[in-house]
Amino acid sequence: HTDSSAASDVYKRQLFALSNIGRDKLSAIEFDLEKGAETKVLFEHKEVDLDSVHFSRKRKVVSDCLFTTWKSERVYFDEEAKGIYEYLESQLPDCNVVLESMNVDENKFTVRTYSDRSLGAYYYFDATTQQLSLLANVSPWLNESELAHTRPIKYLSRDGHTIHGYLTQPPGKEKNLPVVVNPHGGPWHRDVWGFNPEVQFLANRGY
């Protein structure tokens, strides 16, 4: 299996992709197009599949890999990409940060954020000046202070397997609450951390 977000370095005849051939999780690999074979594992996570591998066309390097534990995380191979994300995350705390698009010089970006209490916002970011400007709020009608936080939990099943999930509690209430279990589809699917209107409605009603 290879991922559709794979990138190639046509000058070196290499393909950077995700593969689970010979392993039970999607990992970032380097593939030699002339040999028709995988030549290197760039990164693999011991618990989860990788979501994507990203390539800088300007610098001709693999910049980072994205994966989801309880929330989206990255491992970096490129200091410039790492610096951009770390700066944005310092300016936009308590949310996931995504680079939606960029210019050819890879120094001007459209940035998307989201969290467990908001559908997020779009920003314009100029990396040369570190200017970050709000373009639009996706859900300006939501008052985050009135909404519930979602946090990760895990527990052991009867047969000894670790089950991961999320717990959302009404603000200011922690004990003796009625519980609604909201399972995801699948079995290949999983829930992710972010804004869920159904969950927020139930938390607002005291569940």
Show the residue positions of the predicted features.
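Short loop/turn segments that connect beta-strands within beta-propeller blades
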Residues: D32-G36, A127-T128
